[in-house]
Each structure stands twice: as structure tokens, then as C-alpha cells.
């Protein structure tokens, strides 16, 4: 689960980290009032969406009057912000963050992720702040500094000081960085985060360090023990198809192709997407119906897949283990009839009663193509999507 910038900064403040004074507002009038509360003559207004690249898309602006702040809120509230990290529809803006202006001398980067290979939290720091860190890691990996956190003892101040020295910080900045480093590490562990970024972490004109941005992603599997953070969830930022899928315990991720994929098992789903790509097709989604490919789940899966107007054909790849393939085939037939599927559907069944399942599909009289193998299924669905 992603958090908005203002929510991330709220958590930063709770851990004693330096953040700008600001208010999240949802009306133009509240934006103007926020300027009065903050004081000063310059403010930064930011559209709140779960995506990066807001500045280049016009979603971040420096304003010098509360009227301009209100105008910015009027411009964006209720609209959709399109950035390089969103799809063509963009993300809806329901909140504007109004905060004090910061005089920046230098921008740094500080972030943390769970490193699966070492099974540790790993902090990354760089002198190249304010830019896409993935590009820096790809083009100049030597500019990425790392510190691995031992889960038994947690982040240690000496690790923060070591990173600070490597970043070229001096004097009070070293102490400040170490405090920010250990504070972020504690926040990361306390709240079961999957990712945390401060980009940029800035050196102000007076030499002090300041967290100018906050990006936080929480491990969805840990939400059951983070009741406080459940209230931070903003459903307006969810993909409606993914939200629909979650209600039926389906794992769905939208992609940009035209071949819908319905599979039971995450590994098989990824393999299916790979083989579709191998044969020249482009998957429109990742969809794992899980172990129980019942008629109800298959029906909802079809509804979700077909809600994407780009889908020209559907590949159903099911391995029958405990559930027999003939029962799965009957569920697929019932779902196709109920939903009224008009596009070609290619089905590959393997496992328990696979031959009987293929026979049931062949005798259904529906526009369902029974594939003999995974390769055959991929070839058939690519042809069907191309109208051949």
C-alpha cells in the first residue's frame, strides 16, 4: 500500500525527522487558509497522487500569494494528473499539500528497501538527489552508497556517520544525517515498510539537512498488524480493476497488451505471460485466480479482463490438481455464457481429467478453442488476437 507525500511526512514528524510545515487541503479556500497558517511570502503547492514525476507534469508549483495557491487547488482538485509513471488516464487529485518554501543549497538521496538476496533492510544514499534513482543506479552505479541493517541490533549511528562522510557532509550535518538515518530505519521496521525514499534529502542554505519529500510503500501482507495505517489508504488511487479483483481474492495487475491472461498460480501466470511474449503477443494483464478456479471466481475474472477495452483475446491456462479439469471446464463454459464473452477464448487444461475437460469444451458450442499444449495455446491466442 502506497502513502501520499503528506502522510509520509506525518510519519516522519512523529519520528522527529525534519520536514516542512504544511497542510493537506481539499478545497481552494483551505489552500489559502493554509498559507496564512504557515506564514511567509512563498509556498510550495503539490498535487497528491501515488506517482512520481509530478513536477514535470505541472503538479508542483512555487506560489507567492495565497490567491495563486487557491488557483492551483482549483486547477487540480477533482482532476487527473498524468505523469510518466501513470497510464494515459492519470491519477485523481483529491488533496493538495501546501507547505513552506525551503531554500535549497544541495540535493541528496536517501532510501531503503528490503533486499531479498541478503534478507536485510538495505539503505541507499547518493549525492545525486532529486532525480530518478533507478537511472543513476543503471548509468553510474558507483554513485550509490549502501548500508545493510542487521535485524538483531537495528540501524547503528556509526553506519549513518559512515554514509554521511562518504556523501561529503561535514560538522553538524554528520550528526543530523545519522539521526535521520536511524529514525528512518526505526520507522521502516516499526511499520513493516517495503520501500522508503527521501528524494531529495536537501542541505538548506543554512547548512541543515531537511526531508523535502517522502515516498512510502507498506508491505500489504503486514497490514493486519498495522491498524493505524489502514486509515491512510486512499481508494481513489487504486486501479478499479485491481480493487474489484481483491474483493474476490484474485491477484490482478493491469498491463498494456491485448491478450487477457487467466491462470491459477502466480508462477504459472508469469510463465504464461513469458510464452505469450515469446510468440509475439503482448499480455494485457497478470491474473492469478488461485487454487480454486470455481465458476464464480472465473466469472469475476472474465469480467475484470473484459473491462479492458484493449483485450482482443483471452488465454485461460489452468492446471488441475485437486480440482478436476472437467469441473474447471464446466465453470469456464458457465462463466463465458453468463458474461457473454464475444472475443476468442483459448483454453489450455493440464492435470487431473485434462482430456475430459478438453472434450467438455469442444462440445460446448461456444467460441472456445481448446489448446493441446502451452505452446499451442500461446500460438493460438496470438493468432486470435491478430484476427487470424
Swiss-Prot record:
Substrate binds at residues 264, 321-323. InterPro entries: ATP-grasp, ATP-grasp_succ-CoA_synth-type, ATP_grasp_subdomain_1, Succ-CoA_synthase_bsu_CS, SUCC_ACL_C, Succ_CoA_ligase-like_bsu, Succinyl-CoA_synth-like. Keywords: ATP-binding, Ligase, Magnesium, Metal-binding, Nucleotide-binding, Tricarboxylic acid cycle. It comes from the Bacteria. GO terms for molecular function: ATP binding; magnesium ion binding; succinate-CoA ligase (ADP-forming) activity; succinate-CoA ligase (GDP-forming) activity. SUPFAM superfamilies: Glutathione synthetase ATP-binding domain-like, Succinyl-CoA synthetase domains. GO terms for cellular component: cytosol; succinate-CoA ligase complex. One of its GO terms (biological process) is succinyl-CoA metabolic process. Binds 1 Mg(2+) ion per subunit. Pathway: Carbohydrate metabolism; tricarboxylic acid cycle; succinate from succinyl-CoA (ligase route): step 1/1. It holds the Pfam family Ligase_CoA. Residues 9-244 form the ATP-grasp domain. Its EC number is 6.2.1.5. The keyword Coiled coil does not apply. It catalyses: succinate + ATP + CoA = succinyl-CoA + ADP + phosphate; GTP + succinate + CoA = succinyl-CoA + GDP + phosphate. The keyword Nucleotide-binding applies. ATP binds at residues 46, 53-55, 99, 102, 107. Belongs to the succinate/malate CoA ligase beta subunit family. NCBIfam families: PRK00696.1, sucCoAbeta. Heterotetramer of two alpha and two beta subunits. Succinyl-CoA synthetase functions in the citric acid cycle (TCA), coupling the hydrolysis of succinyl-CoA to the synthesis of either ATP or GTP and thus represents the only step of substrate-level phosphorylation in the TCA. The beta subunit provides nucleotide specificity of the enzyme and binds the substrate succinate, while the binding sites for coenzyme A and phosphate are found in the alpha subunit. This is Succinate--CoA ligase [ADP-forming] subunit beta. It comes from Pseudomonas syringae pv. syringae (strain B728a).
Amino acid at each position: 500500500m502506497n502513502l501520499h507525500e503528506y502522510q509520509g511526512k506525518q510519519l516522519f514528524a512523529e519520528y522527529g525527522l525534519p520536514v516542512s510545515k504544511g497542510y493537506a487541503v481539499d478545497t481552494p479556500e483551505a489552500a489559502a487558509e493554509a498559507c496564512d497558517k504557515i506564514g511567509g511570502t512563498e509556498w510550495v503547492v503539490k498535487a497528491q497522487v501515488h506517482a512520481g514525476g509530478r513536477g514535470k507534469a505541472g503538479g508542483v508549483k512555487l506560489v507567492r500569494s495565497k490567491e495563486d495557491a487557491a488557483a492551483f487547488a482549483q486547477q487540480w482538485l477533482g482532476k487527473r494528473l498524468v505523469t510518466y509513471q501513470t497510464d494515459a488516464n492519470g491519477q485523481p487529485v483529491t488533496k493538495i499539500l501546501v507547505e513552506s518554501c525551503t531554500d535549497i543549497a544541495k540535493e541528496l538521496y536517501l532510501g531503503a528497501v528490503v533486499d531479498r538476496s541478503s534478507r536485510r533492510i538495505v539503505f541507499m544514499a547518493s549525492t545525486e538527489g532529486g532525480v530518478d534513482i533507478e537511472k543513476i543506479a543503471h548509468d553510474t552505479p558507483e554513485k550509490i552508497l549502501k548500508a545493510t541493517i542487521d535485524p538483531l541490533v537495528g540501524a547503528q549511528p556509526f553506519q549513518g556517520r559512515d554514509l554521511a562522510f562518504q556523501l561529503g557532509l561535514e560538522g553538524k550535518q554528520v550528526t543530523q544525517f545519522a539521526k535521520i538515518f536511524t529514525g528512518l530505519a526505526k520507522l521502516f521496521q516499526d511499520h513493516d515498510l517495503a520501500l522508503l525514499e527521501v528524494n531529495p534529502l536537501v542541505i538548506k542554505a543554512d547548512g541543515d539537512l531537511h526531508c523535502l519529500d517522502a515516498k512510502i510503500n507498506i508491505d500489504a501482507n503486514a497490514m493486519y498488524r498495522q491498524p493505524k495505517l489502514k486509515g491512510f489508504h486512499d481508494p481513489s488511487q487504486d486501479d478499479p480493476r485491481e480493487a474489484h479483483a481483491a474483493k474476490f481474492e484474485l491477484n490482478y495487475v493491469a498491463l498494456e497488451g491485448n491478450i487477457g491472461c487467466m491462470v491459477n498460480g502466480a508462477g504459472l501466470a508469469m510463465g504464461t505471460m513469458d510464452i505469450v511474449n515469446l510468440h509475439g503477443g503482448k499480455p494485457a494483464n497478470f491474473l492469478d485466480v488461485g487454487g480454486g478456479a470455481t465458476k464464480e471466481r472465473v466469472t469475476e475474472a472474465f469480467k475484470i479482463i473484459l473491462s479492458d477495452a484493449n483485450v482482443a483475446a483471452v488465454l485461460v491456462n489452468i492446471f488441475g490438481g485437486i480440482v478436476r479439469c472437467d469441473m474447471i471446464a464446466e465453470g469456464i463454459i458457465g462463466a463465458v455464457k453468463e458474461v457473454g464473452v464475444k472475443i476468442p477464448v483459448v483454453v489450455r487444461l493440464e492435470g487431473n481429467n485434462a482430456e475430459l475437460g478438453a472434450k467438455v469444451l469442444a462440445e460446448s458450442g461456444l467460441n472456445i478453442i481448446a489448446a493441446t499444449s502451452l505452446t499451442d495455446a500461446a500460438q493460438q491466442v496470438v493468432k486470435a488476437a491478430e484476427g487470424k
